[in-house]
C-alpha cells in the first residue's frame, strides 16, 4: 500500500472530443485541480494528468455528418478543451490524446499481456448488421430495446433505463441509426476479456477502495450480481488496432483509461522520470470522474490493471450530477451552459465559476446552477465577506501606517483560529469535501470581519496608535492566511490579493506558512477591489441567453421516428391495465431505478427507470398504466413483473395516467 511519502498521480475522466465543454464537465475538472493545488500546498509530490478521449462510434458518426475525418474532429475539440482548461485555471501537467502513437502502443502492450495470461479469448457472436449500409453496427450505430428492462437503449448502454452496459449483439429490435433500416444479425468472431474471473478480486478490492462512498457502493452492487465477460473489440477502422487483426479495433473503454498510463509515460519521458514509478510501484493513483462512468472505472479498469500487472487506483472520486435552473441537464432541450460561449466570452471571472462549483454542495451531491445563485454567492460571500475584509485591512494599514505592516503583538487567539482553519481546510480537502474546505475559509473571513469591527481601529488610531497597529497586524495576518487557503479555489484572484500584501509569488507557499508571522515593517502593495459585484443587468442578460436557447430547442423539437407497422392482433396481445402505486423505494446502488409495488388487480413488483424524474414519496397513491403480460426480468438483481408506460420527452420519462381515477386493474383498450 502507498504511504504519505509515495508519489501521487491524479487523473481526470477524459473529455470526449465530440463537442464543446459545458459546466457539467467542470464538475470533475475544477475539484480535481483544487485538490492537486492543495496537495502541493501540503508538500506532496503530485502529478496531474488528463487528455482527450478520441475514439468510439459517436466521434465517427459526428465526423461523417460534418463531412470531415474523425482525426480532424478530434483535433478541433482537443484544442477547444485545452483552451477552456487554460482559461478556467485548470492546469494539467500533461494533456494528451488517446489517438497519440504512445497510447496505441501502450494499449496494444496491455492487450497482449492480457492475452498471454489467458484473460482474453475469441468467441463467435451474433451482431447487428445493416443490409442497406452493408456494415456491422457497433455501439452508437445501433438503437433498440434493452433486453433487461425493455426501454429504448443505445447499442452499448441502457442510458434511459437500468443503466446497464450492453454487450455487442445484446440489444433487441435493433435498428441502424444511420438509415433507420431494421438490422439483421450475423455471426462474427470477437474477443472477450474474462471479467467474470475477477469477481472475487473486485469484491476484495472495492472494499478497500478510497474516494467517494457513492462510487464504491455503486460498483459493489454490480459486482455482487453476476459479472459477464466483456467484449473488447469492435468492427471499425477508427481506433487502436486489436493485436493481430486488421478488421477490429479495441473497444473505446479499453484504450481510453489506458490513456492515463500513456500520458504519464509521455510526461515522464520529457522529464527523465521512469513511468513505472507511478504504474508499477507504490504510488497513490486517484481518479476524478463523473458519476456516470463509475462502472467503467471501478469494475472494468481495475480488473484490466490487475490482469496485466499494473498498480491499482487507490481512490475513485465521483462527482454528483448537474441541474440547470432546477431542471435536468439536457443539451437537446437547451438546459445547458457552455463554458466558452455562455461564461468566458461574456466577460465573467473564471474564478467565480470555480468557487461556485466547489462551494455549492458536497462533491457527491447534485449541483443546481443558476445565474441568480451565482450572483448571490459572489456578491455575498466573496464581495461582502472575503473581499470586504481584505480591502478594509490593507487600505487602513496603507493609509495610517505608511503603507507598511505596523508593529504590534500577534494575538494568540487569532493565531489559534488561523491554525484551526489550516487544519480544517487540509483535512476537508484530503477527504474530498470541497464545500467544507471553502466554508472553513469563509468562516475565517467572518471571524476576521468581526475582529476588525469589534476592535474599531478607526477609533483606536486616535487614542492608542500602538494598539491600533497591533489590531492591524493581526488583521493582515488573517488576510495572509485567507489568501493562502483560498488559492486552490481561486488562483487568479488570490495572486492579485497576494500582491496587495506586497508579496511576489504564491508558487512555493505552503498551507503551514499561513501561521508564519507577517513581518513588521513589510511594505504593502496598492489596495484594489478584489471582487466585482455581478449586477442585476448582467444576470438578466445571461438569463435571456439561456431562455432563448430553451425556446429554440422547444421550437425545433425532435422528429418522431416512425416504427414499422404491426398487425392489430400483435397490439391486442398486450395486457394493458391501470394500476395504483402502493409502495415505492430507491434501489440501492442505482441512481435511475425505483422498486414499486403496484396494484393491478393483484400486487406486482415492478422496477422502473424513473428515479431521476420522480421521488418515491410522490408516486405512492398515483395511478399509472402498466404492461402486465411481459416476461419477468431481473433488473439490478430485483425481479420486475411488468412495465410502466411513459412519454419520452428528450430522455425524461413522463408517466401516463387516466384523466380520472378508475379501479386498479381496469383494462385498457
Swiss-Prot record:
Organism: Methanothrix thermoacetophila (strain DSM 6194 / JCM 14653 / NBRC 101360 / PT) (Methanosaeta thermophila)
Main location class: cytoplasm
EC number: 6.1.1.10
Catalytic activity annotation: tRNA(Met) + L-methionine + ATP = L-methionyl-tRNA(Met) + AMP + diphosphate
UniProt-recorded Gene Ontology molecular function terms: ATP binding; metal ion binding; methionine-tRNA ligase activity; tRNA binding
Entry's cofactor comment: Binds 1 zinc ion per subunit.
Sites where the protein binds ATP: 331
Coiled coil (residue ranges): none
InterPro entries from the UniProt entry: Anticodon_Met, Met-tRNA-synth_bsu_C, Met-tRNA_ligase_1, Met-tRNA_synth, Methionyl/Leucyl_tRNA_Synth, MetRS_core, MetRS_Zn, NA-bd_OB-fold
Compartment(s) of residence: Cytoplasm
Residues that coordinate or bind Zn(2+): 146, 149, 158, 162
Gene3D superfamilies in the record: HUPs, Isoleucyl-tRNA Synthetase, Domain 1, Methionyl-tRNA synthetase, Zn-domain, Nucleic acid-binding proteins
Keyword Nucleus tagged: no
Subunit structure as annotated in this protein's UniProt entry: Homodimer.
Annotated protein name in UniProt: Methionine--tRNA ligase
Placement of sequence motif 'KMSKS' region: 328-332
EC class (word): ligase
GO-annotated biological processes: methionyl-tRNA aminoacylation
Function: Is required not only for elongation of protein synthesis but also for the initiation of all mRNA translation through initiator tRNA(fMet) aminoacylation.
Domain of life according to the entry: Archaea
Domain tRNA-binding span(s) in chain numbering: 570-669
